[in-house]
A protein has these predicted regions:
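Sec-type signal peptide cleavage vicinity
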Residues: 1-327
Length: 327
């Protein structure tokens, strides 16, 4: 009996993970990496409501290990564009590479929406190399939405993993995302009660930047080449039922909440409105500016002679660099 117990004890002592640096849960499982999140925003994502993700939304994460964050060689992440899915207030993955390593500092770079090496809905991921950081490229699509999904970015550096999983749980590892693109919105109003009854049917304009690239390590967005007049991207929305234009106040005409996402630094041109079946052009748009994380709302006032405009800029995000927090 004693020899059998001794043998059982020997077996139990060898039932461990081969890599002694990998942390353990219940002595035989690695500790998975999970994240909490928030979005620095008044309005957020393509849906333009809320400051949190919805269940089943997916982000991409690149992860490196080392005392210092990567700044030259980006070719060997331990997590290479791993998809994390949001559910029950946290992001998690089943990918086997997403586990903590004992006594290592981990550096994470996250973005939304998840992209692959094949362009989909205007997004494309390019892995890092020995000298170039990983990137996500974004392309404005012709039509109503511009960029189809809001581009968000965050980074986070952990302290060295000690093996105490409660210190590194999702509610402690929070990714705070920041918006990397810009938005334009429209509000059409009558100057006063003397303007005849009017209805808004459509809004159309063109943009001079089609694409941009986000450095996933630094969070810096770089615009592509400026487009010539002949090749500018047209964005527009036409309503099935025209909206009644009222004096400024509640219930303003917005062309069905037409608010496309565009590249920061874009200049718009050829802004036209269809009002009472007439096409009206808004001129002198050079004063409009579009910055990362901002909504520029263009108020177009209909008067007895035509239209005039003004603009106001509001934060799409709170001020912030999109960095993560470890609590």
């Amino acid at each position: 009996m004693i020899s059998m117990l001794a043998m059982a004890a020997m077996v139990s002592c060898t039932n461990e993970i081969e890599n002694p640096d990998q942390p353990q849960v219940n002595q035989n499982e690695p500790t998975p990496i999970e994240f909490g999140s928030s979005i620095l925003a008044v309005q957020t994502k393509a849906a333009k409501t809320g400051t949190a993700f919805s269940d089943n939304e997916i982000i991409g994460i690149i992860g490196f290990k080392g005392d210092a964050a990567p700044n030259a060689d980006y070719s060997s992440p331990f997590m290479d564009n791993i998809s994390f899915t949001y559910a029950t207030n946290k992001f998690a993955t089943t990918n086997a590479s997403a586990v903590w390593e004992r006594n290592a500092t981990h550096h994470f770079y996250a973005y939304y929406p998840l992209a692959t090496t094949t362009e989909t809905n205007g997004y494309k991921y390019t892995a890092g190399t020995a000298s170039v950081a990983p990137t996500v490229s974004v392309t404005v699509q012709t039509g109503e939405e511009g960029v189809k999904q809001d581009l968000l970015w965050s980074n986070l550096t952990s302290k060295k993993f000690t093996g105490a999983s409660t210190e590194f749980s999702a509610d402690k590892m929070k990714l705070q995302f920041a918006h990397k693109l810009a938005r334009i919105a429209f509000k059409v109003v009558k100057k006063d009660e003397n303007v005849p009854e009017s209805a808004l049917k459509a809004v159309s304009f063109k943009v001079d930047y089609k694409d941009a690239s986000l450095n996933l390590i630094t969070g810096e967005l770089t615009k592509g080449s400026q487009i010539t007049d002949a090749n500018k991207i047209s964005l527009s929305k036409t309503l099935t039922t025209a909206e009644t234009i009222t004096e400024d106040g509640s219930g303003n005409a917005t062309c069905g909440d037409f608010s496309p996402i565009i590249i920061p630094g874009t200049a718009i041109s050829d802004l036209t409105l269809t009002i009472n079946e007439q096409t009206l052009t808004v001129s002198d748009l050079s004063t409009l500016t579009f910055k990362e994380g901002d909504i520029t709302t263009v108020t177009i006032t209909v008067n007895s002679k035509g239209v005039e405009f003004s603009a106001a800029i509001t934060d799409w995000t709170s001020t912030g660099a999109g960095t993560g927090t470890v609590e």
